[in-house]
Amino acid sequence: MPRSDPSPRERLAAIQGIRVLSRDDLRAAGLTTQRVTASVREGRLMRLRRGAYVSKEVPNEVVEAVRSGGRVTCLTLLRLIGVFVLERAEVHIHMPPHLSRSRHRRPDSAVLHWGECQREGQSHVVSLWDAVRQSVRCQTPRAAIATLDSVLHHRLLTSAEVESIFRTLPLRFQVLSPLIDSSAESGPETFMRLLLRSLGLSYETQVRLPGVGRVDFVVEGWLVIECDSREFHEGWEKQVDDRRRDLAAAELGYVTIRPLASDIFGRPNEVKEAVKAVVEAFGTRVGEQRAPQLRRSARETAVARRTGQRKGRFSGVMAAG
């Protein structure tokens, strides 16, 4: 069987397990100054800064942080372990408050976090708790909620630990806490959920439909919304599967739309207006009265197929008319 990708928890353990070695560590291991120099020249050791070495390949973000005299933190750590973050460009580095602000060379694009961390981490990376706490302050509200959803969904922190983070944040961030939902499986789902909430629409998340499988949202009881991203919907085979699922949902009386993740993030107002238009256009036809009858009729059809009885496939639709 092909090996599955490491989980966020496994990625976190791997990053935390990186050892940044000091000269004393190397001497204790029996390496003389000459052997250390030779090991660096031969590529067996990497010198990050004076008195800081690593013995194996490490992520570039860790190299940049340690060379700067700091540690990987915030969005960078979360991105490295597979937690959703919206912005991915800059390296986020936690700098010790006592360190001179001009002492070490730092990447021009780095985002520097000064101040004390509240939990113990490693010499090259802050604790996950501190990284999550910093990420709330470092993002827009919607992106922060999506990150928190992802952290909880992957069970990297408990709800109690997230609550403890909010107790340390200024009052203006407290409004975000009730909006967190660990059922969200991706950042686009979080953004879509908040969009639906802003429209005042009723919705359910991660709904399992007979013959269809699990869908991201069922809105107003009849509209299925699937948030399509390249990560999970790329390739013709996946496209075929998606379209067959849409047809199966149609037999149950559901209308399906598939907004792209790039549009959910980059054109939210247009997506919002499109969803609103679909609800207004179809709601009177397949909404409160007709959709339940369509779904009952489709379920009867599914039962008939399983039992070999071809009866009354469209009776529910005709009765609704």
Give the predicted meaning of each segment.
Residues 1-169, 176, 280-321:
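Short gly/ser-rich loop at a beta-strand->alpha-helix junction or flexible surface loop bordering the NTP-binding
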Residues 152-321:
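Surface segments flanking catalytic/ligand-binding clefts of nucleic-acid enzymes
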